[in-house]
Amino acid sequence: MGETKVIYHLDEQETPYLVKLPVPAEKVTLGDFKNILNKPNYKFFFKSMDDDFGVVKEEISDDNAKLPCFNGRVVCWLVSADGSQSDAGSVCADIQSDLPPPIERTGGIGDSRPPSFHPNTRGSQENLDNETETDSVVSARRERPGRKETSEHATRINGTSKMERRRDTGGYESSSTLMSSELDSTSFFDSDEDDSTSRFSNSTEQSSASRLMRRHKRRRRKPKAPQIERSSSFSSITDSTMSLNIITVTLNMEKYNFLGISIVGQSNERGDGGIYIGSIMKGGAVAADGRIEPGDMLLQVNDTNFENMSNDDAVRVLRDIVHKPGPITLTVAKCWDPSPRNCFTLPRSEPIRPIDPAAWVSHTAAMTGTYPAYGMSPSMSTITSTSSSITSSIPETERFDDFQLSIHSDMVTIVKAMSSSESGLEVRDRMWLKITIPNAFIGSDVVDWLYHHVEGFTDRREARKYASNLLKAGYIRHTVNKITFSEQCYYIFGDLCGNMANLSLNDHDGSSGTSDQDTLAPLPHPGAAPWPIAFQYQYPLPHPYSPHPGFPDPAYIYGGGSAGSQHSEGSRSSGSNRSSTEKRKDRETKGGDSKSGGSGSESDHTTRSSLRRDRAASERSVPASEHSHRSHHSIAHSIRSHHTHQSFGPPGIPPLYGAPMMMMPAPVSVMGPPGAPPSRDLASVPPELTASRQSFRMAMGNPSEFFVDVIKEFWGV
């Protein structure tokens, strides 16, 4: 009797293995090789000769197939199946009775399934086989002692006894089901049940869909004592996943413009394996229904069954049905997601954000009153939004439920409600081109939120137009500052919403004389008293006063003067708009003192007026030192007189009406903000520095005139 040498390579190992089969080379089969090798979880590729390609590696899976032989030996490559991690040993087989052999799959819906597919209900067993494309079978055993009697006469599968299967409908028991999912290799499943056979696949009468198990590690059992009648499950999948869950969804296409699904076809060498839901688009009929999910298997559309239908035909039929008017009925088999996303995620209404230490400290300080209150109303409190990390000043009683939103509401109110943590808008960190966008939201979510929470929109298009107006107004902002609104883009809340912490709604008291005035002022002088950060209303700046070139230069007053100029100071500092005629009358009543400074107050210290007075003084043969002394004395007298009169303007803020160079010196602040530098009265400044300081202020007030006067002085004009 001849023998055959078989050289086989195992996976990626460099050194091949050699076994000898006691069978002649012309009669050796794959079953003979498997009996010697006993490696059930491998694919077998043999060196073969093809007429078109020459020497190739041919996969052989039929145990009765003869092996190709070259020079009296067989060369084989063993490749482990994907996801297969089995131990060596034999697998227990059914030894109950002779069953008809499995029906060969002819291609159809049950031919191939993605690993995430799982059924949840039981149905009839019509037109159903229990063998998948990987030759996986289900067997049952009632009595263990019969194994030795029949195992020698049974055919072999993967080096183990292959018993003929019995077709029977039966229930499931969690303690008796053995499951494995060697998708790409020849394997089988057995079950120890007393009264019924555990089925690996089943279907309903209308779908005849088979189920493909998720790939799992299969452990082969060692022979047990005869008295053990049951065995526990080797799989982590419970019996609730062993049944097929089929749902029928009827969609009303009159309310929606499109179906909103993408389909994926599954195919293999034996034919097409069915149509599956690839993705679901927002705004479609399927997304609005919510019961169909990605990965579900599409079994039937209206009255058209997709069984034994190719993928191309199924797509064509589905396209024709969608184009027809009327409702659409979809019958799908639910899938089982191996990586659920919603089990351990937080609900949308309670988003969690990383702790911002600065916001935490400021919030705690505001609650405990550590910082001085700069115009905070007692009914106001600082609330940190967890959804958008925006620190905004809103009343304690103002919550999302209190907002009565309509299309006539202010945009600020709508955006404030949208940014609330209880609004329902999904605001979280997003990834875009590997860039993390903190606290972002999708444009389509904004449109949906506006359409459902703001009254007055007749359709979704109006809500989208309103969202576009929010973008143009700056209440929401694109990550790259695009001004065109798109529902597929990410957006964040704009600066107008983020800077609400700077708003102050308190009314100023009348102690400073500004209770009846509307003023717009810059930040106060460091030595001045604290002033509110912002105002409720903003008025346009008044037009600066500019005398006609033909008129003589008026005497611009910086502070209070003598008793005769008290009315002039009070009216100007309070911001009243006096006409130029009244100003000229005041100067006429003051006599000729305006030539030397205007009734004892500080005269115009711009460079232009200073140079003109110097030239006039030289013509009258008045010493410059006398003019300088008189001018400094006027400054000191002006400061002293300023403290004797009532101030009618905000501290440290220039009057709004009059020439642009009018400016009052800041009074001495009794109480300054924390950390402010100590201030010094202008009267205590040395005389040689006072004039320079005032001249610098005048030059900064109107630098163009300063430049012209310097040019004139240089050329002696």
Swiss-Prot record:
InterPro entries found in the cross-reference section: DEP_dom, Dishevelled_C-dom, Dishevelled_fam, Dishevelled_protein_dom, DIX, DIX_dom_sf, Dsh/Dvl-rel, PDZ
Residue ranges of every copy of the DEP domain listed in the record: 421-495
Presence of keyword Mitochondrion: no
Cell compartments where the protein resides: Cytoplasm
Gene Ontology molecular function: beta-catenin binding; frizzled binding
One GO cellular component term noted in the UniProt record for this chain: cytosol
Basic and acidic residues bias locations: 140-155, 580-593, 602-618
Tissue expression profile of the protein: Expressed throughout the epidermis.
Main location: cytoplasm
Regions of compositional bias (Low complexity) in chain numbering: 173-189, 564-579
CDD domains: DEP_dishevelled, PDZ_Dishevelled-like
Pfam families hit by this protein: DEP (PF00610), Dishevelled (PF02377), DIX (PF00778), Dsh_C (PF12316), PDZ (PF00595)
UniProt biased composition (Polar residues): 118-127, 199-210
GO biological process, alphabetically ordered: canonical Wnt signaling pathway; ciliary basal body organization; cilium assembly; intracellular signal transduction
Compositional bias of kind Basic residues: 212-224, 629-645
Residues covered by region (Disordered): 89-235, 552-653
All copies of domain DIX, residue ranges: 1-82
Keywords: Cilium biogenesis/degradation, Cytoplasm, Developmental protein, Wnt signaling pathway
Ranges for domain PDZ: 248-333
Family statement drawn from the similarity comment of this UniProt entry: Belongs to the DSH family.
PANTHER family, per database record: SEGMENT POLARITY PROTEIN DISHEVELLED, SEGMENT POLARITY PROTEIN DISHEVELLED HOMOLOG DVL-3
Known function: Involved in the signal transduction pathway mediated by multiple Wnt genes. Required during ciliogenesis for the docking of basal bodies to the apical plasma membrane.
Record's protein name: Segment polarity protein dishevelled homolog DVL-3
Taxonomic placement: Eukaryota, Metazoa, Chordata, Craniata, Vertebrata
Gene assigned in the entry: dvl3
